[in-house]
Amino acid sequence: MQKIVFIDRDGTLIAEPQPDQQVDSLAKLDFIPKAISAMRKIAEDTTYELVMVTNQDGLGTGSFPEDTFWPAHNKMMSTFAGENVNFAAVHIDRHFPHDNSSTRKPGVGMLTQYFEASYDLTNSFVIGDRLTDVQLAVNLGAKAILFMPPNGLAAVQSADVSGLTEAMKQAIVLQTGDWDEIYEFLRLPARTALVERNTKETQIRVELNLDGRGRADMHTGLGFFDHMLDQVAKHSGADLAIHVNGDLHIDEHHTIEDTALALGEAYRRALGDKRGISRYGFLLPMDEALAQVGIDFSGRPWLVWDAEFKREKIGDMPTEMFYHFFKSFSDTALCNLNIKVEGDNEHHKIEAIFKAFAKAIKMAVRRDINELDNLPSTKGVL
């Protein structure tokens, strides 16, 4: 299915002059910094269809004659075309706000054709500098990129929290005033996975965003296990939520093993075909302990474990399950793991392992925007 980037015009691609907010002469045509170069890269480096959607209040009336609009608009279009930026469609609504027209943003009256099954609106984006652009994304079932140039309109509007509905907050995936950041976001889409694993022993839900901010939401029923999984999220930079309902009244084994299996599966799915990743990835000290974790997302599971624990449990987690956790992760993530730790304090040793594990993952999944067509293997597949 075809994904689309719906792009606002005034305030997003070109400056919106004040106070009349009308680009009605060539003298008023001023491109937003980096918009042309970023749009060229988006057009050349991604598969999104580019669609312009703009409200032009009263176009064709005495307050905004057509002959003052088209010269600047056509110059803008020819400038983009000269940089290999070709819009599949340009939708212009001419109504005033008080007309309450369904074709005026955030209405979707001009855009009904994109609800056809051949379009993937769920993975499409609306880029604009107004909250009406965010609402348009909600109405389309797409995601929103709120463009916020310094002292721009969106910066003022977004300060009014009451203007943002919960649906709008959920729709916004990026707020920025930098077109280069928009390009990188579209070129490097978030790598996410949702895994649900349900057996007679455990019910597990894992939500993973490899390109998150290190946010953690752990509820396994085992406090120390939650603490270790928090380290994975924090030190890998991934957003990770794990909710488990396990048979802890019998034993901790199923909860820990099945969580690792689901987590490994989430990483395997989120990595996709692994193009552009570093693939390999850590020595990490914690007080007297030193952990070494090497990882290779090779497509082949293997675990080398050189770690000895003298206590039966640390917190409420059996130490015998440490090996089992990483073995299960390796099995479903299809990765090689080489883990070694030295130290005296048992808590420090296992926490150092989990932190080093997270850092190794962070290194291995890092993408190079200039290597996205390259697979880090001479075999041609991972």
UniProtKB/Swiss-Prot annotation:
Q: What keywords are annotated for this sequence in UniProt? A: Amino-acid biosynthesis, Cytoplasm, Histidine biosynthesis, Hydrolase, Lyase, Magnesium, Metal-binding, Multifunctional enzyme
Which PROSITE patterns does this one have?
A: IGP_DEHYDRATASE_1, IGP_DEHYDRATASE_2
Q: Which SUPFAM superfamilies match?
A: HAD-like, Ribosomal protein S5 domain 2-like
Q: Extract the Gene3D superfamilies matched here.
A: HAD superfamily/HAD-like, Imidazole glycerol phosphate dehydratase, domain 1
The places in or outside the cell where this protein is found are: Cytoplasm
Q: Which PANTHER family match?
A: IMIDAZOLEGLYCEROL-PHOSPHATE DEHYDRATASE (PTHR23133:SF2), IMIDAZOLEGLYCEROL-PHOSPHATE DEHYDRATASE HIS7 (PTHR23133)
- The molecule here is called Histidine biosynthesis bifunctional protein HisB
Q: Which organism is it from?
A: Spirosoma linguale (strain ATCC 33905 / DSM 74 / LMG 10896 / Claus 1)
